[in-house]
Each structure stands twice: as structure tokens, then as C-alpha cells.
Swiss-Prot record:
Name of the protein: Catalase-peroxidase 1
Catalyzed reactions: H2O2 + AH2 = A + 2 H2O; 2 H2O2 = O2 + 2 H2O
Signal sequence coordinates: 1-22
Molecular function terms from GO: catalase activity; heme binding; metal ion binding
Major enzyme class: oxidoreductase
Essential cofactor(s): heme b
Record keywords: Heme, Hydrogen peroxide, Iron, Metal-binding, Oxidoreductase, Peroxidase, Signal
PANTHER family linked: CATALASE-PEROXIDASE, HYDROPEROXIDASE I, BIFUNCTIONAL CATALASE-PEROXIDASE
Highest rank taxon of the organism: Bacteria
Record site feature (Transition state stabilizer), residues: R94
Annotated cofactor note: Binds 1 heme b (iron(II)-protoporphyrin IX) group per dimer.
Active site: H98
Amino acid sequence: MDKTQSSQGKCPVMHGANSAVASNNMDWWPKALNLDILHQHDKKTDPMDPKFNYRDAFNSLDLAAVKRDLNALMTDSQDWWPADWGHYGGLMIRMAWHSAGTYRVADGRGGAGTGNQRFAPLNSWPDNANLDKARRLLWPIKKKYGNKLSWADLMILAGNVAYESMGLKTYGFAGGREDIWHPEKDIYWGSEKQWLAPTENPNSRYSGERDLENPLAAVMMGLIYVNPEGVDGKPDPLRTAQDVRVTFARMAMNDEETVALTAGGHTVGKCHGNGKAQDLGPEPEGEELEAQGLGWLNKKGPGTGANAVTSGLEGAWTTHPTQWDNGYFHLLLNYDWELKKSPAGASQWEPINIKEEDKVVSVGDPNRKFNPIMTDADMAMKMDPEYRKISEKFYQDPAYFSEVFARAWFKLTHRDLGPKSRYLGPEVPNEDLLWQDPIPSVDYRLDASEIVELKAKLLASGLSVSDLVATAWDSARTFRGSDFRGGANGARIRLAPQKDWQANEPERLQKVLKVLIELQASLSKKVSIADLIVLGGAAAIEKAAHAAGVKITVPFIPGRGDATQEMTDVESFAVLEPLHDAYRNWQKKDYVVQPEEMMLDRTQLMGLTAHEMTVLIGGMRVLGTNYGGTRHGVFTDKVGVLTNDFFVNLTDMAYNWKPAGSNLYEIVERKTGAVKWTATRVDLVFGSNSILRSYAEVYAQDDAKEKFVHDFVAAWTKVMNADRFDLA
């Protein structure tokens, strides 16, 4: 046999790290710290030009023209995916709803803000079946308007226009959502290994009676909300009502908003289950190349229009599924309902003895009519006592229902867009809403000389470097890049609930705030407490850097306002409470998750990279900002001086590192055996993890003293300005 024949059938390429058959580091060492969540959305993956600014691009968009095109699309039925009753409104609303509906208030992740429905896993979730068709229908419009209109904005706008085209007066629309270019790595969707895994399966998201794992909101892997057939697919409206209440609360919705959204979402459109689910092909990510990113293709027939299969339930909720009306409550409340099976075998509720005029015209044959249907979640709106009261009120007052729904829909689709200062476009409502975390604008300016004078007064106030730095940090660290909440702007650290959070050391905080408020009152110039808090941190860092022999000016841009208690929803802000903070070497209690894992999660939410995290930890330790003044990780004899001592001593082989208790270690001199310092896991991980050690070594080098200070200041400034959307 010659060499040519013997080599036939072998793979012609070397298997690299991108090969599906290759094992990666996490396969070999599953307990290793995975820094990937800090390394996502790199500019290398972004196809936009370096100078591209989406805000500027969107502001140049003719939004009215886009809406005209979207209105035309709604009734321009395509043969490859026909519109139900000649109107795509229901499909577009479901797409927008499911884009926004992944948001959860606990960590601010999910939601409509990034266009992530285009990528795995969301593009292939069972609950998102056939939304790939909705996005393909939108492609001509996305293609036409190009970079002026992100997919993220287009999907929400399409849902808005769909409602408007069917008769609802919407509350408004804001653009400003920038697309990502690959799946997110930081969002925890659950630990289940199969779609729609029931509660009793391994790795369930439930414990106890029915306690849903934090921060999850959906009841099953692959669902946006609740199971439409009932808890674990077993119909029981009262049990489902409990799931609905928990799920919507974790999306920051109250009972009235929940009923409005459920009813308003089901006033239009239909469910699809007129066929066999087993006839459908794989989801988009599991399909073959020739499917070109589409999934759920019917292998035994057209599988479109009247024969489409999506959820498995079959039918519309209302008599007129292409118009906005009060028909949902008319049918739900005036008829008795019984359990039936759809053609696909799914459990659904249908009315008993329904009048002919209340039936729904068939999608495929205008001469035929069918029963409307309700899901188990819809029946919960009737069976649950509290939901029933709200449903009755909406039924009796259709105008009130329309208004509440329009506002709830706006909240649903804009919750993760952040404060109103990030909103773009001519349809932004004028009203300031409490859930937008409003902050009053400022009416003063500070020039360079006034800033210098203020810094001198702050340093002469009697507050220490650690007090000023820790207070500024505590004020700013609440920022979440997931939904753009929190941060130093507004100075809500002086208001409930933040002033009483254990993480903020209330007694120390009140001492610092008292000094700052007195200083503010003594000034001839108007300055917000929010600006004074941040400027105090800047002044303290400059002093600490100067003591280390490095002269530097910490960038400071005034303009932060002071929020009032009336502008602050205490319950809404409660989810921002830090339960751990590696930067101040503190956690409220021991958790199942290791401290270093929680450090990465907090770091990612603040929008920091791995090397920014590294330099900030090292700087915060030597500045003496540990919670309660503990000495863990303070590897220096010059506390309050901004040196690179943390890294120098961390990487020094003159020391041994020994466990001394739960999350506690002793740093021992090798020669004498004497304990030199103590440390926690979030200190020693910078010497243990190979990636973090590589950063630590950079800052430990003899030529790194100035670089360390400059990098620390840059990372610090990034945190302080994270919520300054007015500077974008």
C-alpha cells in the first residue's frame, strides 16, 4: 500500500484549540478559576470601526421611516413563513417579549440590551422556537438601515410597532441598545443538563418546598417564564400562580403589572401546535450547514401557517388575535374552562359551551372557527384570588388596562437599558419613572482651581486616606454593567437602604458623611455630596501616591447629582446590596461559592478586566481599606502609601503560605517560621492562579512602581465614572 492510499481518510488539518475534539484546561482542571467572563466582548470580535459610536449613529436614524417600513412588514406575508391571519404582529411581539423577558433583577443580567437572542443558547431555547423566522423577516429592514439600528433596538421596536399596528397606544420607545458579537459567558442560566428538565431531576434549580435558585427567574432550563402547561407540565392553575408570582417578581414586576403583561401579551397572536413535535428538526445550533441558521424545520411537510408547531399548544387566546381589545378578559372571566389536549398533545384549557361569535377564525380557512385557548398561566389570572381581583378591574375598565399594560410593556422592554440619560430617540417619554432610578441634574461647574481647593479641604477635614477611599469605593461599587444601575452618581449611599447596609459599615459611613455634609454647608460654591465623595477618594489617592514618590492627578469630572429618598425605591435598590466585596476583603457570611468566584462575578458586573481587578486589589490593600480595618492581605509596613508592596511580597519566595482556618491563611517566613502576615483566598489567588500571577508579577517588578500607580488610577477612575453616561 502506498503512502497516498494509507493517508486517505485522515483529517488533513492539525487539531487546534478550536477543534470540537480537543480538551480544554477546564476539562483537565475543573476546579481552576475560570477568568473567561472577564475576557468577553473584546474589541477584536467587534466588526465596527474603532471610531464608530452607536449613539451618534442612532441619533442620525430616521425613526419614522423605520416605523413605516415595520408597519408595512406586519401585513406583508411571505410564502416561506406565512403570517397568521395576514399579520406578523403576534410573532414580532413574542420575539421582543422573549428578548426582554430574560432579564432578572437579582444581578441585572439578561434582557433586551445586547441582542443576545441571536446567539446560543437563547437562539436555540425551546421557548424561543421559530423566533429565528421573526428575525429573518426583519433582516431586510436591518439590512436597509445598517449600523444606525442595532438588532437589539430593532427587535424591541418591532414589538412596539406591532402593538401600535393593532391598535394599542404605546407609552414610548427608546433606543440605545448596542449589539454584542458572540454569546455572553457571564450569565448563569441554570445547572440542568437537559431542556425543560422537571423539578425532581438532578441539578434542579429548586430546593425546599419550591425555592427557586438565585438569581434565576425562569422555572425551567430553556423557558423564558413559566411552563404554559403547568408546574412540570402538570396543569394546576393555583400552583402555576405561585410560579408566575415568583418569576415576575424576579423581573421587578408587581401583581398588577404581571396580570397586565400576561393579558396584554396574550391579547394578540396565537400558540402553534397543529402537528407532531417529533416531526421537527433540531434547533438552530444543532441543525446542518444548509439550514443556514434556521431550526425547528418540519421534515414531513410544510410546517408553516396553520400547520406550524412551536410550543405545542394550539389556538389563539382571543376572538380577534390581530387587534388590541379587551377580549382576553371577556373570554377568561365569562366562560368556564376545561382541560383539553392540543393536536400536538399539549395540555391547554378550552371554554365550555362557547358562543359561536366568540370563537376564533381559523388561520388556514376563513370559513372555519375554533375554540380560543388558555394556558395554565392564563387560568392562574382567574383562579388566584389576587390576580382575579386585578383581572376583574381590568375587565371593567379597558382604558385603565391599556394604560397599565403600555407602561408595564415599556418597563419590560427598557428595564435593562439603564437610567433615562441613556435613552435615545424622539419617542422617549418625558415622565421620570421611579424604576429608572432618577437623579437630578446639576446646575454648577467647577474649574481646575476650585477642584484643587476642594481637595485640600477634604484632606484637611480630619478624614483618613482609608476613610475617603473606602467611602468613594462603597458609593461606586454598586454599579452593574448588566442593567446600568447603581454607581456613585446620586450619592444614594446616604439614603435608605444603602446607608444601613452591613457592607457599608454604617457607623463609619455616618461619621464620614457627617464631615462631608458639614464641609458642603461651609462652601460658598454649590457642590453635590456625590461629587464630594468621589473627589475625596481622588484626593486621598493622590496623597498616597505622592507618599510613594509618584506625582499624579486623579481625573475628576464634576456633574453628579444628589438623589432624594423620594427618588429611591427601597425595595428595588435592595438587590444591589453587596454580600461580598473582595476589594475590601469582606463577605457577609460563608457561601457555597468560593470567594474568588464571587470576586470575578462582582468584577464582571462592574465592567472591569482581569488586570484592572488585579491592580485595584493590590492598591486597595496597601491603602488600608479592608472592611473593619482587618489586616488580611495588607502585605506592607507602609499602610496608606500607594506602593506595589502587595505584589512584591505576594511573589517573594522568602515566604510560605499556610492554611490557618476557614478562608484564612498565614504568611510565614521560611527561615524563622514567624508569621509575617495573614491573608484570605482572594489575596492568595493572585499568586496561585497562573493568569493572575502573570499580572501580579508585572506589578511586582522593580520598574513597575510608577506603572502600578498609573494603572491603579486608571482602573479607579473607570469605576468612579462607570455611571457617568453624560460623559459618553
